[in-house]
């Protein structure tokens, strides 16, 4: 009986693990697959990540129904947030009932990944968790190869077109196309690079066992190959989100690591920075075309420098909404104009969202969208929840003791902090999925550290 229970639990854990692998694979290669398949099948691929998350919700319901399961630090977050989320949801129902389920998906569904990852990778399965990080970091190689191929192809080639077969020349910079690699559009590629640079840092801190002859042979070269691919990928997109985002999350992760483990991280960090600096210099000399689009987008303009432009965009994103929200009527001011309206795809399921778009109403930043969709109420609870998540993660990070785990958690915390403050979690499912997945990885590492502390006690 006891043996059967262990077998069933391991089978359950493996199913959750496979689901996470399938989710990451789909997220990375969705755009390329949709370009290769008919549009009707491509639409199914588009919703596949949501189907995986709904399946994950079933696994979570089943797992947490057991009385002896370890309670996740974020277990009650989804339930509590659902109840405080009700007022703008009720208001949305008056605008268009079809938006209610869509809004729940956009704001709440992907939170389940914070619970799902620790179910798949329990402390006793740390080697399998390391392999997951290793697999995730390896995806940089094929995505960069596709991006390099796109960079050498004309704009009218099918690989450089959208998933609907339309030209993407409108998104070019200085007449040069901004590549999207295996993703549906350039932004998705940039968001992927932001998270995978952190996953790469984690896989360096927690390397897999070299118990395979192939891994033994390629392991010494892989860190350099993946790092170079990451650098090429970040610059070849031509997007500042990729370059500045990767730099910021790695820098913040490094700061967190220095605070908790200065002896181990400072020397390694300086060596890594020197290697990356030399690699970038060599790449610029050998392949200047990889940097051309980014350089064009980063040039100083006549009326402002590049740094002034970036600063202006950030300030506009953070405070631009305060100009127009005071002009709203009382109900829109407090509870918004309908959740999910500003998200991609809303116009396909909602006539109200379609009418709003036809009126030319649009928002740029996350806080703009939140204020327009849910009013001041949603701004307070949505960003309050995100700040609470960051503070909760910092609390867990402070409890960690194992040096390698601390460093790995520090880089994840850097990503969680940056995206938690600035990421478009309500508008862009890919960002939300990477964000909550990274929190799940963070919690799983926290559990692993706790198990090490218990075994050493």
Can you say where each PLM-predicted feature lies in the sequence?
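A membrane-periplasm/extracellular boundary helix in multi-pass inner-membrane enzymes
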Residues: 145, 150-155, 237, 254-306, ...
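Alpha-helical transmembrane segments of multi-pass inner-membrane proteins
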Residues: 133-161, 171-174, 181-259
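Transmembrane alpha-helices of multi-pass inner-membrane enzymes
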Residues: 54-60, 196-198, 250-251, 408-457
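A conserved mid-to-late transmembrane alpha helix and its immediate loop/hinge
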Residues: 185-187, 354-393
